[in-house]
């Protein structure tokens, strides 16, 4: 399968990521889900967690972002992820990512 889908992670301050991908996984309010090219259109609320973008290999995430929750719009050709915060954690260890996630969740709970 050589098809790709355009994925954008958008924050109020910038476009954190804009790439063609073979697959994207993320945390919805009802659990983790993945999106492939030609996916049925949908709009989904996202929880704070990881967005994993698979560029060349569908078995290894090549770009990983920690987001503060938000909303995603999916069509057959693109995925737009709107979030307040997007942190590139691609090169961090699992322990560092877990620490950043806990920090982000604490910040979000302090705001509410």
Curated annotation (Swiss-Prot):
Keywords recorded for this protein, A-Z: ATP synthesis, Cell inner membrane, Cell membrane, CF(1), Hydrogen ion transport, Ion transport, Membrane, Transport
GO molecular function: ATP binding; proton-transporting ATP synthase activity, rotational mechanism
Native source organism of the sequence: Rickettsia conorii (strain ATCC VR-613 / Malish 7)
A Pfam family that the UniProt record links to this protein: ATP-synt_DE_N
Function statement: Produces ATP from ADP in the presence of a proton gradient across the membrane.
PANTHER family with a match to the protein in the record: ATP SYNTHASE DELTA/EPSILON CHAIN, ATP SYNTHASE EPSILON CHAIN, CHLOROPLASTIC
Keyword Cytoplasm applies: no
Family: Belongs to the ATPase epsilon chain family.
Coiled-coil region list: none
UniProt name for this protein: ATP synthase epsilon chain
Upper lineage: Bacteria, Pseudomonadati, Pseudomonadota, Alphaproteobacteria, Rickettsiales
Any single Gene Ontology cellular-component annotation: proton-transporting ATP synthase complex
């Amino acid at each position: 399968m050589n098809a790709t889908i355009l994925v954008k992670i958008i924050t109020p301050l910038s476009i954190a990521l804009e790439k063609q991908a073979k697959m994207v996984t993320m945390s919805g309010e009802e659990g983790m889900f993945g999106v492939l090219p030609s996916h049925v259109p949908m709009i989904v609320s996202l929880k704070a967690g990881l967005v994993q973008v698979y560029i060349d290999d569908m078995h290894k995430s090549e770009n990983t972002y920690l987001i503060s929750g938000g909303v995603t719009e999916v069509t057959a050709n693109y995925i737009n992820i709107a979030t307040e915060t997007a942190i590139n954690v691609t090169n961090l260890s699992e322990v560092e990512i877990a620490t950043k996630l806990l920090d982000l969740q604490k910040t979000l709970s302090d705001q509410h």
